[in-house]
Structures are given as C-alpha cells and as structure tokens.
Amino acid sequence: PFDGGVYLSSCDKGMPGNLIGLARVDIPAVVVPGGTMNAGPEMLTLEQLGMYSAKFERGEIDEEKLDWAKCNACPSCGACSFIGTASTMQIMAEALGLALPGSALMPATSPDLLAYAREAGRQAVKLAQMEHMRPSDLVTKESFENAILVHAAISGSTNCLLHIPAIAHELGIEITGDTFDRLHRNARYLLDVRPAGRWPAECFYYAGGVPAIMEEIKDHLHLNVMTVTGKTLGENLAELRENGFYEKCSGWLAKFNERYGTSITKEDIIRPYDKAIGTDGSIAVLRGNLAPEGAVIKHTACPKEMFHAVLRARPFDSEEECLDAVLKHKVQKGDAVFIRYEGPKGSGMPEMFYTSEAISSDKELGKSIALITDGRFSGASTGPVIGHCSPEAVDGGPIALVEEGDLIEIDVKERKLNIIGIAGERKSMEEIDAILKERRQN
C-alpha cells in the first residue's frame, strides 16, 4: 500500500480522472495541475480553430489562413488556453482544496510550475505523516459548494456538471445539476477569459488565478474548510496576500502586455465583485416536457437574443448529418437543430464541438437558431447550445420523439425547455402530452 500520492495532470480527461481516482483511493495526496499553454500570435488560441474551419468550409477564408491558424494555435505545452474543460478542472482541483494555493492554470512554460511540483511532493510527505488528512477528511459538501461558486465566477465548462458529481460520489457526497443551478442563480460571473470572454487563459494566472477569484467572492465562501496545506481556505488566502503572490502575478502580466503591445489590467481580466460581468452565474439547468430530468446551457456564452425563443424542430440522429446540413446552408433562421442518440448509452457522449462552432461562427445562424442534444459540448463551445438533455434518446427520452416542424420553446430565465406545438401549430400541454404518448406507442 502507498502512504501518500502526488497526482499530475492537465487536460479534459486526465484531471477529472485523477480527482476521481484520488477520492477513491483516499490516501493523503496533492494534485499538481499541469498549467496552460501560451497564446499564439495575435493572441490566437485553440478554440478558434473551429471558427476558422467553419469559415473555410463556407469559403470565407482561404486554405493559407486556415493553415496559419492550425500551425500557431498551440505554441507550447499545457492545457488549451481558454476556460474549457481542462482549465475548469484544474481550477476545480484548487477550489476543492486538493491543489496548492495559486497552482492552478499557471503558464506551463513558467519555472514556477517546477517549484510548485517540488512543494507538492514535500507536502504529500507531510500529509502522510499526519492524521485525518485524507481526501475524505478534507473535502466536504462545503468544499464542493465553494468550487461551484468559483465555477460560476469563471464561466466554467458544462462538462463540470458530469465530473464534479462523479468526484463527490466517490466521497459519499451528493452533488447534482440542481446544486449547480441553485448556487449559480445568484452568483457573480467575473472572469473575462475565452471562450465566453476576451482574453487567453494564461491571463487568468497573471490576474491572480483562483485566489484572486476567491478574494472577490469570499463573503459567499466557506472559509473554514480544510485544504492540503493543512490550513483552512481562509488562512491560505491571508498567507497569499502577505507573501508577494499577487505582486509576482502582476509582474507576469506586465511581461504579457509587453509581448502583445497591450495594456491589460488585472481588473480587465477578473472583474471586481461590484462590477461583475453577470449576477446570475454562468450556467442554467432547464427542464420541461423535452427534458424532464434536465438539460444544461452556458448562458454566459449564449446571445441574449436566444434567452427566450420559439423555434422549429430540425432533428438529426447523428452529429455528422447535422454538421453537413449546417455547412451546406440547409439549416435556416428560426430552427432548433437536434442531435440525438449521442448520450452516454448512445454513442458514449462525444463533444458536439464542430457543429456548435459552425453555428456560432455564422453571423446569421449564431443568433437565430439553437442546438439541442443529449450529448455534450466541448468546454470551448459558444452560442445557443443546450446539452445533456435527459433522459437521453436511447433511454426513450422525449428528445427521441421530436419530429420536423415541432415548436420548441427555450426560456433560460424561467429554466424551461418545452415542446409547445406540432407541425408549426401551438398546442396545449395536455395535447402535447397525448401526441408524445401516441408517438411513443408508434
């Protein structure tokens, strides 16, 4: 048996996999997040490739421009430089108290990363010699609530709604999509970083990283939770204020500005609490006769025009069919595009990234249609996209019963997702229920 562990990972699957494994093994351990890659020339970052690819397919740019983007989007090692699933889960590791304070999402090329890795090893040895320092001792329901409030502040990936409940399950704690929805409703959204914001992810660290976010929202956090430092969250934050951490981050931001000829300030990246980008979090869980068990939307990355919309259903049974229709202009303004049979039991729940980017990068479609799926999305996805529609089609969920021309109502503020009409004609909820029952029998 091992006495302790150090878990190193960076990306979409590795980081949540490590956190689930760490919770299951339940020995004293410290997580070392692998950091973020640098942005390329013109602040190019990887999630923009979907946009470039869609523009190329539509004939809006030539192959030379596409090749330029492909060759420059990943100039270093590290997680993709936007708040996608990899970045979100690195941040969650620190927010849960399982990584050293200030260690999440630093540039992977920074010499500080090696220093944090060495310190993590030393701390893991200390934890192994102490009592009551296993993950199950440190991570409580309050720790998860802290992490979810940080998730709201950063406009984190919707895939977090899959990973965080799985980690909590290993620790005997129940966290659901409703937990996210409840905490997000009145939470501040502060981080102006891609894909929902303006700047590449390395800027997050230069603005003070997770500790800076926590300082802004600390009145809503449980500051007495324990962490892998052997101290409480509140003690960690106080220590960082005193040891020059934020001054060091400011120095890195100055170098970034020098590199790109910009004059970005900390407040441009992480907004002050009273000047938040949004005051209702960043995700919403929608329910209705189309998703009785819920569906999720990142509303901070969705055009305001689509917060309430009535659209015509255009169902597809695979992403390939749908993407082809979007790129060939067979999808029109006012359509609700469905991709179904892409849930966990269907095709293993792959990401619908290229279809979502083809829609959001289209000036006309990006603000006039929606994409609804029982699959999931890349953390890079933007636009009017709704995923995790449950029950999934393979399980006989209502998404499997949608037909061409059904009227679909999306209401983000009211958290509703409903079929409200058939063949373009509005019907009562009772009539809709009867028609869906008949379709199910057929």
Model-derived features: positions:
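A short, small-residue-rich loop immediately preceding and capping a beta-strand
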Residues: 1-18, 30-33
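Catalytic or ion-coupling anion/metal-binding cores of large enzyme and transporter domains
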Residues: 15, 21-27, 34-368, 372-392, ...
